[in-house]
């Protein structure tokens, strides 16, 4: 018992230190400030109606909003669902403020994994920081990719569960697997969960090969079987968001378009996922991949802070530019000369960490090493995207779901987990058997030093141009002299980081030599290795972390400044939409104050985006009219000004005729040629034959909106004959129910994105209610999964005892 208490005390102390470090790392939060994250600012605009609905309805949930893209489900906007067992577990970690609690999760989750490997707890601490302080993981927190960060934080826990089961730790392995997989999926960033699957599949493959060779397939199959059960339960515990997202994805930009033609009339390349160019837009350059270990090999981030001690600053001051202007310019220098459109920071994993991992890859054998090395190489190759088309194309066109995700460069998260695992295994070897591995350790060190020195030599002979694809714009903006200084600055940071790498590798070799020849003890060696790793990773991360982004709480709660134009529009209490052309579909400022046709989302409603692109390309104001855009916010000398659109067609209108067409392309073609006040267009696939118009048109017919909320709309209708009514609301069949006088009736898609309804003569109340059945169905699966998880735990805990009692 005393040994157990000491064991627990040690780990509890480590975990408390992680929490203290995470809070101290983001020290501005200690004074009550909060991190202003750009993506979360946009999310605030998108989620406004969700928060308002919860506040007004006793924290009840709406699964539909009107304030963005004309209306869309909230499934990918932080929707809360019933029976969220895993949410309770996740909330335990949220005792710390954001982003500190996510940094703590990085450290805690990876610490659990490293203890499972197993390695000494002190080496596990080293590994936790090697993983948690990698630049990419910290930068995604700064810009607000919180769901991605949380999903990444739980990745090590899922791998730990797999390894526990492989090592026949059945109960621990089962619990950790369910929690690790479940919490990773619950984070709601399925791209990261998909990449986790890559790691797990490779682990399973190499452990299967090993089990087959060693004739231990029975134990392996038991481990994989239990892990599969864990996986199914983790899916079940996340059934509602998974099913809802799957349902919505068919209508989102993540699914293939129904259009056969591009806007210019050329043939569209068909895909059941995202467009090829969109998927591969952010592809890592092959040479640029060296930034994993040399951060500014291609200039670092798109904007580097070179500081007032830089040669560029001195040049600007000598040219007569004021010191304050020179400081401003050198705080944001376009040193990046890679091919990606924009780069917040290089995905630096640490040259010392890589040295240990490289060493481990050379000297280790076995399925774990093989899986980690293979996963790392595969993720690197895939991150090259369009720069390595034969592999990228194979995955896009042949591997299920791969074409549902963009930014292939982010697949490097796989190696950002695998490399620290290898590094920990390598460090454990040299600390436990220094004499055995002394010579072996110097082989990768010499290779890395040779590579770094070779890069310096290549620079010396002019092998690198240091020219960027954006230099023509920089030349136009700043002139040739300043451009040449920027290019020179790229050369300087290139050289500085290579020399920095040489020094760090030399220090690591020196520390190991001191330890091997017994000049220092093991604990001192570990502390020194830890110190240079923290210096290495922290030094690079701090180049890009901006503490000025921590602001007062009031700024977070009101991230957008209301303008006089917004106030004027808000005086209108009718139902309408607002369009801000400057933002297009890339900003949620308008959605924060109004019902907007714009917004900010990675999975926009596909047909709405296509209609907007069609409107923009053809400059058809009639499209704004049928979307009930009553106000257009345009830039003027006084700021934003509201322009009233007198032609907006309102909430609903009665049409004279229905035009039937064969395809989605035909709908868009026809939209250009007809009067949309009188006619509506329906596709054959949308039950065109069911939506017909009587010859007797009653021009005295009336329809009026009488009640509205985000998920309920009611209209009064009066006509002497049957009519077809078009509503300026987005058509989404899964969840929206149309009723006439309380009786459910079918409604149809017209004009590419809108709803239409056939209404009999007389006075009627028409209503639309959003009640998605997928939420109810998913909730039932969740309850079943919670029950099964509990039953299996009870069997594990009491099964052996019951079995022995009945003998």
Regions found by a protein language model. Give the residues of each.
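Transmembrane signal-anchor helices characteristic of membrane glycosylation enzymes that use polyprenol
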Residues: 11-48, 230-244, 378-382, 454-456, ...
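Membrane-interface coil-to-helix junctions
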Residues: 19-110, 129-152, 267-351, 382-392, ...
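Transmembrane-helix motifs of polytopic, lipid-linked glycan transferases
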Residues: 101-118, 353-356, 422, 509
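Transmembrane-helix signature of polytopic, membrane-embedded enzymes
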Residues: 114-133, 168-174
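Contiguous transmembrane helix-bundle modules in multi-pass membrane proteins
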Residues: 144-153, 165-182, 190-227, 231, ...
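Polar, glycine-rich mid-to-C-terminal structural blocks
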Residues: 222-284
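Extracytoplasmic
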Residues: 257, 261-267, 531, 535-699
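Active-site-proximal, structured, solvent-exposed surfaces of multi-pass membrane proteins
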Residues: 630, 678, 682-807
């Amino acid at each position: 018992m005393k040994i157990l208490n000491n064991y627990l005390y040690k780990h509890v102390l480590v975990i408390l230190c992680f929490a203290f470090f995470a809070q101290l790392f983001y020290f501005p939060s200690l004074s009550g400030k909060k991190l202003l994250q750009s993506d979360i600012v946009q999310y605030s605009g998108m989620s406004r109606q969700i928060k308002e609905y919860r506040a007004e309805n006793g924290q009840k949930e709406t699964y539909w909003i009107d304030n963005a893209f004309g209306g869309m489900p909230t499934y990918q906007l932080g929707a809360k669902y019933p029976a969220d067992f895993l949410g309770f577990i996740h909330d335990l970690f949220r005792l710390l403020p954001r982003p500190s609690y996510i940094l703590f999760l990085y450290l805690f989750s990876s610490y659990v994994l490293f203890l499972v490997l197993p390695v000494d707890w002190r080496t596990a601490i080293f590994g936790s920081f090697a993983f948690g302080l990698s630049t990419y993981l910290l930068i995604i927190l700064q810009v607000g990719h919180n769901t991605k960060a949380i999903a990444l934080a739980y990745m090590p826990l899922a791998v730990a569960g797999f390894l526990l089961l492989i090592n026949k730790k059945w109960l621990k392995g089962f619990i950790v697997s369910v929690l690790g997989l479940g919490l990773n999926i619950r984070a709601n960033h399925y791209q990261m969960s998909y990449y986790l699957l890559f790691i797990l599949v490779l682990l399973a493959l190499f452990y299967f090969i090993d089990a087959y060779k060693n004739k231990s397939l029975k134990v392996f199959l038991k481990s994989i079987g239990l892990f599969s059960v864990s996986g199914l339960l983790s899916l079940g515990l996340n059934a509602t968001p998974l099913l809802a997202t799957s349902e919505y994805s068919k209508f989102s930009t993540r699914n293939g378009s129904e259009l056969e033609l591009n806007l210019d009339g050329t043939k569209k390349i068909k895909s059941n996922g995202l467009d090829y160019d969109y998927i591969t837009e952010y592809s890592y350059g092959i040479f640029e991949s060296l930034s994993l270990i040399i951060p500014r090999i291609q200039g670092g981030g798109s904007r580097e802070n070179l500081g007032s001690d830089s040669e560029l600053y001195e040049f600007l001051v000598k040219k007569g530019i004021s010191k304050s202007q020179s400081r401003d310019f050198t705080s944001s220098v376009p040193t990046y000369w890679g091919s990606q459109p924009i780069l917040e920071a290089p995905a630096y994993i640490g040259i010392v960490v890589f040295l240990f991992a490289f060493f481990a890859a050379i000297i280790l054998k076995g399925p774990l090493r093989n899986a980690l090395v293979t996963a790392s190489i595969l993720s690197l190759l895939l991150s090259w995207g369009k720069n390595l088309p034969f592999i990228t194309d194979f995955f896009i066109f042949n591997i299920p779901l791969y074409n549902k995700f963009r930014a292939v460069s982010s697949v490097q998260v796989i190696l950002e987990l695998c490399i620290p695992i290898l590094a920990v295994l390598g460090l454990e070897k040299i600390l436990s058997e220094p004499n055995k591995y002394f010579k072996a350790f110097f082989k990768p060190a010499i290779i890395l030093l040779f590579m770094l020195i070779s890069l310096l030599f290549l620079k010396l002979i002019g092998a690198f141009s240091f020219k960027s694809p954006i230099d023509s714009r920089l030349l136009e903006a700043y002139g040739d002299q300043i451009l040449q200084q920027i290019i020179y600055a790229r050369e300087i940071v290139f050289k500085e980081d290579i020399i920095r790498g040489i020094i760090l590798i030399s220090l690591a070799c020196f520390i190991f030599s001191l330890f091997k020849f017994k000049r220092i003890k093991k604990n001192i060696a570990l502390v020194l290795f830890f110190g240079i790793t923290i210096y290495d990773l922290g030094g690079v991360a701090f180049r890009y972390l901006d503490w000025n982004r921590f602001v007062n709480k009031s700024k977070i709660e009101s991230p957008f400044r209301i303008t006089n134009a917004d106030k004027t529009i808000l005086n209108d209490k009718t139902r309408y939409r607002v369009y801000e052309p400057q933002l297009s579909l890339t900003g949620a400022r308008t959605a924060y104050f109004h019902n907007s046709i714009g917004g900010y989302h990675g999975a926009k409603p596909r047909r709405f985006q296509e209609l907007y692109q069609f409107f923009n390309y053809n400059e058809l104001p009639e499209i704004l009219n049928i979307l009930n855009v009553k106000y257009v916010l345009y830039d003027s000398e006084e700021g934003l000004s509201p322009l009233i659109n007198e032609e907006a067609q309102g909430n609903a209108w009665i049409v004279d005729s229905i035009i039937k067409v064969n395809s989605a392309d035909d709908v868009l073609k026809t939209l250009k040629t007809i009067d949309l006040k009188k006619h509506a267009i329906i596709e054959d696939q949308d039950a065109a034959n069911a939506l017909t118009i009587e010859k007797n048109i009653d021009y005295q017919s009336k329809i009026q909106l009488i009640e509205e909320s985000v998920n309920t709309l009611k209209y009064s209708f009066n006509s002497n004959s049957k009519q077809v009514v078009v509503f300026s609301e987005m058509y989404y069949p899964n969840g929206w129910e149309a009723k006439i006088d309380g009786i459910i009736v079918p409604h149809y898609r017209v004009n590419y994105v809108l709803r239409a309804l056939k209404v009999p003569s007389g006075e009627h109340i028409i209503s639309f209610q959003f009640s998605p059945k997928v939420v109810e169905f998913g909730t039932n699966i969740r309850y079943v999964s919670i029950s099964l998880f509990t039953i299996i735990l009870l069997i594990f805990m009491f099964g052996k005892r019951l079995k022995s009692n009945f003998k």
